[in-house]
Amino acid sequence: GALSNGALTLGDASYKFNDGHFSGTVNAANFNTTSDATLKTNVETLTGSLDAVKSLRGVSFDWLENGNSEVGVIAQEVEAVLPDVVSTNAEGIKSVKYGNMVAVLIEAMKEQQLRIEALELKLGE
């Protein structure tokens, strides 16, 4: 419900808000994503992340709905490379889980760093 300070609450600690759609901008100090090891199984380090990132395209675009300019990626293009970071709703509209892409970027950066260090060693010889 609405609070006196203008904030909006959705349920309470026992209520879990699973799905939602917001058109426009949502501002918050932080969005926390549950990531506790005790809630996970079959944990494996990602491989091939650098190749995946290299095949992605960052784009600028205007939203059809309101004409606002943005930058981002195209969900269909991401889905072709990283299907686990794309969701499709009941109407067939695709969404990118940008937060989940961080793990891919971390591993891609580590792969790139290994390549840089190997080249530095060659140059030092």
Predicted segment positions?
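C-terminal intramolecular chaperone/autoprocessing and neck/assembly modules of extracellular spikes
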Residues: 1-98, 115-125
